[in-house]
From Swiss-Prot:
GO cellular component: plasma membrane
Annotated source species: Homo sapiens (Human)
Pfam family of the protein (one): TMEM106
Gene that specifies this protein: TMEM106A
Matching InterPro entries: TMEM106, TMEM106_C, TMEM106_N
Known function: Activates macrophages and polarizes them into M1-like macrophages through the activation of the MAPK and NF-kappaB signaling pathway. Upon activation, up-regulates the expression of CD80, CD86, CD69 and MHC II on macrophages, and induces the release of pro-inflammatory cytokines such as TNF, IL1B, IL6, CCL2 and nitric oxide. May play a role in inhibition of proliferation and migration.
Membrane-topology descriptor: Single-pass membrane protein
Protein name (Swiss-Prot/TrEMBL): Transmembrane protein 106A
Amino acid sequence: MGKTFSQLGSWREDENKSILSSKPAIGSKAVNYSSTGSSKSFCSCVPCEGTADASFVTCPTCQGSGKIPQELEKQLVALIPYGDQRLKPKHTKLFVFLAVLICLVTSSFIVFFLFPRSVIVQPAGLNSSTVAFDEADIYLNITNILNISNGNYYPIMVTQLTLEVLHLSLVVGQVSNNLLLHIGPLASEQMFYAVATKIRDENTYKICTWLEIKVHHVLLHIQGTLTCSYLSHSEQLVFQSYEYVDCRGNASVPHQLTPHPP
């Protein structure tokens, strides 16, 4: 009888040992789990089953069951801390800084080179003149010069010239020409234009025709508008000048190009 009880006790101890050994270790850091409908197994650093240790939480994907559906097998996302060396945060900050710096430098250069600067129009004076008379009128044909200076870092195009010539506050000549004059960046060009005038004034006629008068000059007031275009933008430049023209004979006075202002 005593022998029977001792055998029964040893059998129960062996059974308890086998039952305890089949349980997973509470402090283990990895638990195998598999997807439903698949023979593949994965290893996770966070146990899927809840434990008494406060450092572990229940896996939100498998809800502690240790298995995930097969359709979610390729949708697992690994969360990596920002300070992880695999992200190389120092290099990331450097790349962001260099990108911002390059954008700022590029923008500054674009603004500097494309910022519109002044286009200067300066009348350079009379180049030549021819005169003719009839019984009461003076026909005076003059050729003048305009110096055009482009202060921009891109070319401009002069498209139109409109002007009028006045004598004693009366319009004696008009010009309206369509042009295609190209002026390069930081360059200057000379433009010639001709105006045919007709003066009908008795006193002016006497000044130009009487031989007793030694000085045969008439004062002409020239005012005009020059239209130029650049970067899909048109600009009108106003200029004016006063010219003393010899109305007794023909004249030719060449002028040099005015240098571009610094």
